[in-house]
Curated annotation (Swiss-Prot):
One of its GO terms (molecular function) is arylamine N-acetyltransferase activity. This is Arylamine N-acetyltransferase. It holds the Pfam family Acetyltransf_2. Transmembrane segments: none annotated. Catalyzes the transfer of the acetyl group from acetyl coenzyme A to the free amino group of arylamines and hydrazines. Substrates include isoniazid, anisidine, and 4-aminoveratrole, and to a much lesser extent, p-aminobenzoic acid. Homodimer and homotetramer. Changing residue 70 to A/S/Q: Loss of activity. Belongs to the arylamine N-acetyltransferase family. Its EC number is 2.3.1.5. It comes from Mycolicibacterium smegmatis (Mycobacterium smegmatis). Keywords: Acyltransferase, Transferase. The keyword Transferase applies. The keyword Hydrolase does not apply. It comes from the Bacteria. The gene is nat.
Amino acid sequence: MAMDLGGYLTRIGLDGRPRPDLGTLHAIVAAHNRSIPFENLDPLLGIPVADLSAEALFAKLVDRRRGGYCYEHNGLLGYVLEELGFEVERLSGRVVWMRADDAPLPAQTHNVLSVAVPGADGRYLVDVGFGGQTLTSPIRLEAGPVQQTRHEPYRLTRHGDDHTLAAQVRGEWQPLYTFTTEPRPRIDLEVGSWYVSTHPGSHFVTGLTVAVVTDDARYNLRGRNLAVHRSGATEHIRFDSAAQVLDAIVNRFGIDLGDLAGRDVQARVAEVLDT
């Protein structure tokens, strides 16, 4: 499809057609973070996320004002960046955040972007789809140095072909995911998306996760529990009912539930309040 770039830029609050430079990449990542929430309502309601075409992603995240998970966020952003003149490679990763060292090897079910900026050396890791701990700035795809984002410091380490992204959270380095720099075709990403949106053991199928990152805070909703992380302090809010959770989804996170009107969203949310 011919990307409706203007529609996307309006969705994230930017005007005009920006130049494909590093400043634009930073601005788009920041605007996307604060404008399009992370959410898994489709898998939770039994709706597979199978189509990662530009048409499908634009229709859901822009036209219908929904959110999505990594394959959708980074899928849409990849198409946008290519339309602007950036060179984009899609990569796959394994989520290791909060996993025990001796846990089984996780599947490659995370999607990130490797982006080249015209006229600049090297490549940048871009990820607007890792929920409440997602990168809030592009960082150099370079192992070793600590790299400051709009929020926490991050760093990449490398072991053979594997890169590991870690974030400094409350003073400690937390590994988030590993990935290789081998580009992945869309069909491979659609297989991963199908798996995490339909497998009965997937946490996207069994629990509710919603997140958004503003300029000064990270908002993370898991079931009935909302955590707001801001300037080293965390506020915890516990909702009493599924109705209150849905109100937060609509009014705090800005998700339009109109395209789910034929489904009993409140009943399904009530089933997973404490998961």
